[in-house]
Amino acid sequence: MKMSFRWFGPTDPIPLEYIRQIPGMTHIVSAIYDEPVGEVWPLDKIQALKSTIEAAGLQFKVVESVPVHEDIKLGKPTRERLIANYQQTIRNLAAAGIEVICYNFMPVFDWTRTELAKKLDDGSTCLAFSTREVEQIDVSQGIALPGWDSSYAHAELQSLLAEYRGIDEGRLWEHLEHFLRAIIPVAQECGIKMAIHPDDPPRPIFGLPRIVKNRDDLARILAIVDTPANGLTLCSGSLGAGPQNNVEALVREFGGMGRIHFAHIRNVKITPEGDFEETAHLSSCGSLDIAAIVKAYHDVGFQGYYRPDHGRMIWGETGKPGYGLYDRALGAVYINGMWEAMEKTA
């Protein structure tokens, strides 16, 4: 299992030199952030990013993410040009030595949280989600949730939401299938492994359909194009926020098939009301048995890439919520410690 750390490029407040100092850290997960969604990522930009990462003594093999344009998800006629661009981006990433591409198929928003800095009993802060707060929002008046204000202008957001009123889960499945049948053969030819990320949280939000939320959804996606190039990013926190999901069992099933190409490992504390907050990685801090999840990866012989996912803000750190240095570093060494113990006692 190869440890990686997400880095948001030159604007990330965390220097690569600090990331390299985490014991066992070998890889960076990043992306090209200044290209408009739907346009081809230029090879020279990819190579420049790779050179920056390698100059710090780290490797760049996983991209997170190559965004999927809304026109593809909506099934608009413009999708064919956008899919062709996506195919070329896959080719360019392969030419630069990338092995895994993480992506998602969530309509409109990649993630949903109602708080970016919920204070915990120990004084740290975390990302959190309140079902009640989301249900009380009148989408016709706009959506003012953390992380969303700069995503869309009000009129643009309302127009996009209106377009999705005609898209139910069945149609979104059709559009995902069309997309996969177009890109997976290209990925396979290039030696790239595509890894779809689950919905976060794994439930419909604001009437928008969600189709990557549970075991049956994941199995259906893999069956659309049944090849190792069509795989999963298995995010324990995203899937684990749904009480219907047994993350350990998912790792054993899909990891045993060799279809998990990228692992996001984090803990969440969930409530009967469907609320959750992101905790420290330690099993006792949340609702997930992280030790059992890591053991499942070990038992199936997982040799892919993983990263400690979102962390709390601790020790006075400020920066991008969920993506501070300190707590993610603690998560990394916690996971690596368990992995080493399993290796030496196997």
Curated annotation (Swiss-Prot):
GO biological process, one term: D-glucuronate catabolic process
Keyword set includes NAD: no
GO molecular function: ferrous iron binding; manganese ion binding; mannonate dehydratase activity
EC number: 4.2.1.8
Cofactor(s) needed: Fe(2+); Mn(2+)
Pfam families for this protein: UxuA
Catalytic activity of the protein: D-mannonate = 2-dehydro-3-deoxy-D-gluconate + H2O
Keyword Ligase in record: no
Pathways per UniProt: Carbohydrate metabolism; pentose and glucuronate interconversion
Keywords, in A-Z order: Iron, Lyase, Manganese
Signal sequence, start to end: none
Role, per record: Catalyzes the dehydration of D-mannonate.
HAMAP family in UniProt: UxuA (MF_00106)
Classification via NCBIfam families: PRK03906.1 (NF003027), uxuA (TIGR00695)
Family: Belongs to the mannonate dehydratase family.
Name this polypeptide is given: Mannonate dehydratase
Protein source organism: Cupriavidus taiwanensis (strain DSM 17343 / BCRC 17206 / CCUG 44338 / CIP 107171 / LMG 19424 / R1) (Ralstonia taiwanensis (strain LMG 19424))
The organism's taxonomic lineage, starting at the top: Bacteria, Pseudomonadati, Pseudomonadota, Betaproteobacteria, Burkholderiales
Name of the gene encoding the protein in the UniProt record: uxuA
